[in-house]
Curated annotation (Swiss-Prot):
Top-level taxon of origin: Bacteria
GO molecular function (one): phosphoribosylamine-glycine ligase activity
Location of this chain's protein in the cell: Cytoplasm
GO cellular-component term (any): cytosol
Gene source species: Clostridium perfringens (strain ATCC 13124 / DSM 756 / JCM 1290 / NCIMB 6125 / NCTC 8237 / Type A)
The reaction(s) this protein catalyses: 2-formamido-N(1)-(5-O-phospho-beta-D-ribosyl)acetamidine + ATP = 5-amino-1-(5-phospho-beta-D-ribosyl)imidazole + ADP + phosphate + H(+)
Pathway of action: Purine metabolism; IMP biosynthesis via de novo pathway; 5-amino-1-(5-phospho-D-ribosyl)imidazole from N(2)-formyl-N(1)-(5-phospho-D-ribosyl)glycinamide: step 2/2
Protein name: Phosphoribosylformylglycinamidine cyclo-ligase
Enzyme class per UniProt: ligase
Record NCBIfam families: purM
Family the entry assigns: Belongs to the AIR synthase family.
Keywords attached to this entry: ATP-binding, Cytoplasm, Ligase, Nucleotide-binding, Purine biosynthesis
Enzyme Commission number(s) of this protein: 6.3.3.1
Gene Ontology biological-process entries: 'de novo' IMP biosynthetic process; adenine biosynthetic process
Amino acid sequence: MLTYKEAGVNIEEGYRSVKLIKEYAKKTMSEYVLNGLGSFAGMVELPEGYKKPVLVSGTDGVGTKLDIACKKRKFDTVGIDCVAMCVNDILCHGAKPLFFLDYIACGKLEAEVSSDLVKGVAEGCIESQCSLIGGETAEMPGMYKEGDYDIAGFAVGIVDKDKIINGKDIKSGDKLIGIASSGVHSNGYSLIRKVFKNLDEDFNGKAIWEELLTPTKIYVKPVLSLLEKFNIKGMAHVTGGGFYENLPRMLSKEGLSIVINKNSYEIPEIFKKLMELGVKEEEMYNTFNMGIGFVLCVEEDEVEEVLKELSKQGEKAFEIGYINAGGEGVCIK
């Protein structure tokens, strides 16, 4: 008689995976989590101290960066990417991350691989000061090839209604501060995989795949600290669509545009290499973060102090542009 295992789904391996995963998830739990993993749903109590609490949610994945991870069997950092992509998005509205859930899909489940993926998720949650309260691992033979994995996540944060960052006070003359990225982050990998045919080729003394699997930077701690001290008017997470798509998302008014000085900071070597190999500059700014992973909009008289504060926290940051009256979109010059 045909069994589920013979159909390609190994329930015992699933149980073993859950056992390994639980140990990582436990390390992320805050006092606000009301139950552990294994229930039908995760429950989180809202923290005290919020007058009009608003929940802010975001979901994302890692895209085809996972193809490189699968080919090189290096899975312990892409979970960090997954968390970063979600929490950096909700951070743009001033939200402090509360909890996170993940979704892993594969063709054939290997408990050690799913454990490595969740290890990264847990690391990202700890860095983001949020709890991993649940998730789903789906073994789907026929939908995915053996050895292929995918991961996505869902983050929820909290902010007081009167402290939501929505760009409503941004005006002409305000300045833009860019916080450095850790590398390519998690966007543009379909293009990258076309450019770098040989993932083992040398890049500054290491294989290019190692550089490409550098995890996405999480900006939660430095940005939440800034929000307590400065009037941050708008924020943007530079993800898919690069500068051209993401920076205008911080604006809520028509009649304003963004000017970026591309010479205001040193573009990292990985992006220079992509241009050397044939990717045009405009395409680069329309696809990648170009070394700037997160952008803040502040009053001109706060620029120096914000840069000092970021430096104290170990962040590389630069004044990269300004808000302009008239026009639309982004001008890079």
